[in-house]
Amino acid sequence: MALIDFFPNGFTAQPQQEELIDRIDDAFNTGYDFVICCAPTGSGKSFLSKTLSNHSKEASSNFTRLIESYNAFRVDQFGAYSRAEECENEPAFGAFALTITKSLQDQYTNLFNDATSLKGKNNYICKVDPNYNVDFAPCHFNNKLKESCILNSTCDYYCARRDTLTNKFGVLNYSMFLSLPEHVKKREYIICDEASELETELVKRFSRNLNYKILKRLGYRPSDIPVENYTKFRVWLGELIFKIGNEVEDLKKVLSKKRKNASTADTDVQRFRLYTNLLAQIKTTTDNWEDCEYVIESNLESITLKPLRVNNLSKHIFKFGKKILLMSATIIDHANFAKILGIKKYKYIEVDSTFDPKNAPIYVVKDFKLNHKNLKEKLPTLKDNILKICNFHKNVKGVIHTHTMEITQYLKDNIDDPRFLFRIDGAVNEQIIQRHIESKEPTILVSPSMTYGVDLKEDLARFQIIAKASFMPLGDERIKKLFKEDPDWYANQMLNHLIQACGRGVRTKNDKCVTYILDGTITDSVIRNAKKLPKYFLKRFN
């Protein structure tokens, strides 16, 4: 049977989806293990993931038993998973769809009833003690309690883990996937959704911040740490792991004795949580030290470690899939994209948008240009331009992509209008989006971080404003190094974010949303890089 025959039941494949699925099928059947797919917003990329999962096999009965019985997670006296080899010997099955946000996970599970989703432990409340999330539940100090909760399906987190690891279609964010034990992750298909952000996700996962205040508690002064010597710093990290490990073991003994009387405010509880997380993070860094060149930065407050490149880190995702599909609405310069991720042989597939560009026009300015040096001076003019547009669209909802917290804060301080919903003062995107959805007023979302995973369809956004080019900060040593090596990489990052932002308000074929770009720097960059930008995107410019 052809891959298209496994299109989800209850849905009808659109011509564009049929084309994509047929081309993916052909690529996988002609020797390609990697397919890079560039398909615009509204092309139904989620259905590609579900079609692949439908095409895959079910989990073997033995693998299912190993997961459901908890045997897959039992460790021996040395701390190694005792049944890891048995799990790894089971055949690959099913598909994992990996996303960048929890809201994108929710979109999958809302669309497909048989999809299962697993999120981090802090998203689940402990059923034994509701005062805690699962990431610090009583079972951390009581293995018998933990096993009881798992085997009796008491804990929502462990139920979600069980179901997601045995289901044909599991949906996880990249962070969750990377934190799972290796022996339970083998699949027929790994689908990397929003793959244009995969480099960022890998850098985030393998970066570390070591705060001097914490290091001081462990007996280290800044002068004791060899940040200028790469080899000696690696040796020092090994010493740090040993010291933190001893602290964790000592705290376990203390907390196991006073668990009933401990609270989240308890100093020992806080230290345990801090050191446990720090230990896991540093171990991840040292385990991958040889695979990537780390950029080490030090300031008065902390030491930051970031991998310069991710071409050798992508294996922590790719090695678990027999076939890999990477898909995004914004694959800019696919050859460079593949090189960054260490992909040598792949099939590139791109389809045009079926949306009418007249329904989603983009208007730009040319002479008003923002940069780090002139931003403060030009903020008043930027605010005035934003207000003019918002007043013109006074009866409809919209969104303002600010790019920086500085711009967001300035607008909040200088606009006294309840119509504007700011992501500031501890607010998160999910909170202001919910208010936006529930309000009958023509509210406007104002946030620096709604580029991805936000579905503002129909009346939720009839206009949107891009306030500033989202160039990455050159004060970051990693970014500065890569910029010097490859200026095109730097420009591509900004253009990728731009295209994603411009797609937040146009979600269906008949949807309408006008976009205003207020930074002439963006206009210049689009003109310079027009040849490598998607045609459907360029058609929107007026």
Place the predicted regions along the sequence by residue.
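Conserved RecA-like P-loop NTPase helicase motor core
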Residues: 366-377, 425-525
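SF2 helicase catalytic motif II
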Residues: 170, 175-176, 185-220, 297-301
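Conserved pre-motif I regulatory segment
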Residues: 1-38
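A contiguous, basic/glycine-rich beta-loop/short-helix subdomain that forms a polymer-engagement track
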Residues: 150-167, 180-181, 261-369, 423-430, ...
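Conserved helicase motor "Helicase C" RecA-like lobe of SF1/SF2 P-loop NTPases
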Residues: 398-427
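A substrate-engagement module of RecA-like helicase motors
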Residues: 3-7, 57-170, 178, 224, ...
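Conserved interdomain hinge at the start of the Helicase C-terminal
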Residues: 315-316, 364-403
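Walker A/P-loop
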Residues: 30-52
